[in-house]
Amino acid sequence: MDYLIITAELRKELPEGVDFAGWQLTQWEKPGAFLRRTQEGGTICYRTLPQLCRMLGFAAQGAEQVTEVEPRFRELSFMLDCSRNAVPTVATVKKLIRRLALMGYNALLLYLEDTYTLEGYPYFGYMRGRYTHGELREIDAYASIFGIEVIPCIQTLAHLNGIFHWKAFDSIHDTKDILLVDSQETDALIRAMISTCASLFRSRKIHIGMDEAEMLGKGKYEALHGPENRTSILLRHLNRVTAICREYGFTAKMWSDMFVKALRSLPEEEWPAHERQIREQVPEGTQLVYWDYYARQKEKYDRNIKLHRRLSDDVSFAGGAWKWSGFAPLLDHSMLASRLALESCLEHGVSDVMLTAWGDNGNECDLWTTLPIMQYYAEVCHTGAVDISQDVMTARMQVCTGIRYEDMMATSRLNYVPNNPAPGMISAGPAKYFLYQDPMLGLYDRHVDAAGCGAHYRACADEMNLAAQRNERETVVFETMKNLALVLERKCDFGIRLKQAYDASDRPGLEALAEECGEIIQRTERFRASLEKQWREKYKPFGWEVQDIRLGGLMCRMRTTASRIRSYLNGEVQHLEELEEERLPYEVCNAENGVYPIVESREWAHTVTAMDI
């Protein structure tokens, strides 16, 4: 065991000046881990490398004595989304690995749709920042230093939008983002995926995806073979894919939602027969991964774990650190849902638990905003308690990451506007649509609490400014959040003020708003610059072009808005037709004091226009 390498690498994340000279590190066969500080240094006894790394964190924290029994979860993993535009650099993944090690994780899943190189398939991941074989081997080797197993998390059925951008894959395209099942060409592609993973990773576990394939068999498959029950197609494909996995020594994990959706589409009296079909036809050794990022009632987790146990004896759980609703996370909701989910997992003896960090629609939110939830999962796993005090979370996260827990939690406040107090509406990120909604169209204006929204974002900007000063290791994250809040301070209610001034024929007010467009453009450019710096520090360059296009479009529309207002004021046009349209709520719902509740709207294309884009 090369302790010098382990301690030298971990010191990159630990407080400056930490030294492990005089510490005795001993691997034993007993369950759990133990630390005792002495005058000479101290003693750490551990069974597994992740336990050692966690204890080294306690040593750096200044702990006098720590005793932890065996982790409550056999596999505690973090899933890193490497497929939604932002592909983390090898250096970023290594930093993540060090932080996971100090927390006590023993597995890392890399979510790779098409962002890895497949020999013989040049368009697979083309211009998407795909990893080379050398990069993935380097990540795998580095994680092994700390006893962290890197597990490939690929897609073998749906979520393959990237490859269908290219005509090279037309022949195996069923519909939407779904592969054509029962095709020799599809089987050849999947074999290439699995054999490649076998050559790159030490792990003999592989996650084969297969989630959210609702349109399976409804496109080219139906044209070739006629209509067929979706579950039957899925089970046949699953057996074919897992047979290939076994050839390469892999045991498979898969998302379970397609089976659960099939059951819930039927009357409950028909469930037992379909449960038996699934249990009998899911290949032995295949783990069903029950994912749930939403529920705020423990009973839902209890009920769903029991349902999954009727489908398979091998069930794991995946929760979420919500970073996929825009630039700001939803950490209060994530913490609430995580507490309930993990309590249920502990009660029901779920052995494997995963924390996901998806990056839907552009991967706009910074990876490190997930650190509080990451830390929470680790503390629950290693203590068996779900009530972790803020003092413990603060101390542990400070030593494992160098970042203040309270400051990172505060990044969520950009989504917790006056009509959406924490923990907020599930999955709603108003900061994104307040930023991107068109100033002349006001698609979301009825959902803005104009009385307090601007002041809220000014307070957020001040808070993020202080956080940037207090967190030297991740200043850029807080600077970016500050600059976003400064844009939103002016823009969140801009469309409301513009419509009011136009309806009132308030010419001085309209002129002032035309001038304000320039200020919003300047603030947006500062936000864009800090976001780019944040991106360049962590991700490959591929995918940044999307942010340039979106933010550039926003600034262009602000210039157009100023021009349109002035054209109206100087008499070039008699009306501004966009402002004469009645503002409707984005969704039909009940208003309170004239303000409609916020809505879930995460897709940029739906936010910026009512047109096709």
Give residue spans per PLM region.
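Substrate-binding groove of N-acetylhexosamine-processing glycoside hydrolases
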Residues: 2-21, 31, 38-39, 98, ...
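Generic preference for hydrophobic/aromatic residues in regular secondary structure cores
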Residues: 25-26, 35, 66-70, 84, ...
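Carboxylate-rich, divalent-cation-coordinating active-site regions
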Residues: 2-73
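Feature activates predominantly on carbohydrate-active enzymes
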Residues: 41-246, 253, 316-319, 324, ...
